[in-house]
């Protein structure tokens, strides 16, 4: 009876995750038992599961931090806000994908199952409190990501991207586990994050070469999920070859989940090696901001350009991880990631809509879009300007707060690189916007000349995601203070 009550108590701490599990089971049951599948029901079940999970998470807000399942999971505000961000990404990505799936005639059930399972893995990864749970949750997230990227099995580019993603992902997981083994051995056989710190103190191994080896391997393993340079090789190919809604989903959820995990791993087990991991992350941030933004200038594909742009963006996020909670670094990182979700998903919603009408992804083919679809052109322009960090859009205030926290922490060189590369990013975003707004007939491509808008009824779902993301991307600076205050409340 005591064990039952303990299980019931621990289960209540993962109630948002249980809602998603119930939604997964319901989808599987309907798909396997019903001959005539009503697609709208599948969307309704998956979207309702995500919204209910968000609601359950918000009801648990400000509760005392708790450890569940014998130390495997921890619930606190810091973990929960990352879980909220992952759920928000998934909720916005489902309506963004509806029209694409219908037009490409992909299997809807499997797509939604993979989305929900990836979300579930990301949520468990955010709350994981020991090395084994971190690895299992990460693999749950990763395996479903591989399946999503190769969802269009008949597409050669998708198959190529999935193969690269799978091989490099498997290698990075092996490297991560090797780093965990060094951490496990150095701490005297501990796997819980806080107990590892105590174990390192007891064994006097907190400044040993073994810890530095563990730090190096774990940084490489987590770096693959964050995709900073030089761990970025998979990103452009996967972005270009995968279905666009999948790219939109993975581009934000992978970074949110990996950032949550990286923050806890670096901040707790490597507490005594803060100088070393700060140096490692500074190198990654500098390489990411410079290489990502410079290579993005040369791209001709919108999705490849956004891939390199995301590499630069993760460099900005790493600044917040380095600063930590002493100077508001975590709060600024969370705030910027919230804005990044809206900016990035809004951009991808526009790309999905344009791609379905024209069948092209080439940047040159966007020339003159404003003359045919001013709403889509303006939405894309606003999201790109926000990604570039132009005032008074949300991206500007997010970057401003992030850079200010880095400057206060003494990261002058890192912030200077961030400012310079932000100017570079504005250049290639403005180059696209100039193409969108051109009105000269000789520059308008045949794709735009033959552009057709589908009836509102068939694309209202993607327009819903687009409107939400565009509004969130253009939030004025007056909204920054309450958002930052909420983010600061999450610090552990």
Curated annotation (Swiss-Prot):
- Check the record and name the Pfam families matching this protein: Ndh2_N, Proton_antipo_M
First-level EC class: translocase
Which positions, given as ranges, span the membrane?
Answer: 6-26, 39-59, 81-101, 106-126, 131-151, 165-185, 209-229, 277-297, 305-325, 336-356, 377-397, 400-420, 464-484
Instruction: Write out the GO MF terms.
Output: NADH dehydrogenase (ubiquinone) activity; quinone binding
Enzyme Commission identifier(s): 7.1.1.-
A Gene Ontology biological process noted in the UniProt record is:
photosynthesis, light reaction
Q: Catalysed reaction per UniProt?
A: a plastoquinone + NADH + (n+1) H(+)(in) = a plastoquinol + NAD(+) + n H(+)(out); a plastoquinone + NADPH + (n+1) H(+)(in) = a plastoquinol + NADP(+) + n H(+)(out)
Task: Report the InterPro entries cross-referenced here.
Answer: NADH-Q_OxRdtase_suN/2 (IPR010096), ND/Mrp_TM (IPR001750), Ndh2_N (IPR045693)
Membrane topology reported for the UniProt record: Multi-pass membrane protein
* Chief localization: plastid
User: Which keywords are on file for this protein?
Assistant: Chloroplast, Membrane, NAD, NADP, Plastid, Plastoquinone, Quinone, Thylakoid, Translocase, Transmembrane, Transmembrane helix, Transport
Similarity annotation: Belongs to the complex I subunit 2 family.
What this protein is called in its record is: NAD(P)H-quinone oxidoreductase subunit 2 A, chloroplastic
Please give the organism. Phaseolus vulgaris (Kidney bean)
Q: Which gene encodes it?
A: ndhB1
């Amino acid at each position: 009876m005591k064990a039952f009550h303990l299980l019931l108590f621990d289960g209540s701490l993962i109630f948002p995750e249980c809602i998603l599990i119930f939604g997964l089971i319901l989808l599987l049951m309907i798909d396997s038992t019903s001959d005539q599948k009503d697609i709208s029901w599948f969307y309704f079940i998956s979207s309702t599961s995500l919204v209910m999970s968000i609601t359950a998470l918000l009801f648990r807000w400000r509760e005392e931090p708790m450890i569940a399942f014998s130390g495997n999971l921890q619930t606190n505000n810091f973990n929960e806000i990352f879980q909220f961000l992952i759920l928000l990404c998934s909720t916005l990505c489902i309506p963004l994908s509806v029209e694409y799936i219908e037009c490409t005639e992909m299997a809807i059930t499997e797509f939604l199952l993979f989305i929900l399972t990836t979300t579930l893995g990301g949520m468990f990864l955010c709350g994981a409190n020991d090395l084994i749970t971190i690895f299992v949750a990460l693999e749950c997230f990763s395996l479903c990501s591989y399946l999503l990227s190769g969802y269009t099995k008949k597409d050669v580019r998708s198959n190529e991207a999935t193969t690269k993603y799978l091989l490099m992902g498997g290698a990075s997981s092996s490297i991560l586990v090797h780093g965990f083994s060094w951490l496990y051995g150095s701490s005297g056989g501990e796997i819980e994050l806080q107990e590892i710190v105590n174990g390192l103190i007891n064994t006097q191994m907190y400044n040993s070469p073994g810890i530095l080896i563990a730090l190096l391997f774990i940084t490489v393993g987590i770096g693959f999920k964050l995709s900073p340079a030089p761990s970025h090789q998979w990103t452009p190919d996967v972005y270009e070859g995968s279905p666009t809604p999948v790219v939109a989903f993975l581009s934000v959820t992978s970074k949110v989940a990996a950032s949550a995990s990286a923050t806890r791993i670096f901040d707790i087990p490597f507490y005594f090696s803060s100088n070393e991991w700060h140096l490692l992350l500074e190198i990654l941030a500098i390489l990411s901001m410079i290489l990502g933004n410079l290579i993005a200038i040369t791209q001709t594909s919108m999705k490849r350009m956004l891939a390199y742009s995301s590499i630069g963006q993760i460099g900005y996020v790493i600044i917040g991880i380095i600063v930590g909670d002493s100077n508001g670094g975590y709060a600024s990182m969370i705030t910027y990631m919230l804005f990044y979700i809206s900016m990035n998903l809004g951009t991808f919603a526009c790309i999905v809509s344009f791609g379905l009408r024209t069948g092209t992804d080439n940047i040159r083919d966007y020339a003159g879009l404003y003359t045919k679809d001013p709403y889509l052109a303006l939405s894309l322009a606003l999201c790109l300007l926000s990604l570039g960090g132009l005032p008074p859009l949300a991206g500007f205030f997010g970057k401003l707060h992030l850079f200010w926290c880095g400057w206060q922490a003494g990261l002058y060189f890192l912030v200077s690189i961030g400012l310079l590369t932000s100017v570079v990013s504005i250049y290639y975003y403005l180059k696209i916007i100039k193409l969108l707004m051109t009105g000269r007939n000789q520059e308008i491509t045949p794709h735009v000349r033959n552009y057709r808008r589908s009836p509102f009824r068939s694309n209202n779902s993607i327009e819903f995601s687009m409107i939400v993301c565009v509004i969130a991307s253009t939030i004025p600076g007056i909204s920054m203070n309450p958002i930052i205050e909420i983010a600061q409340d999450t610090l552990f």
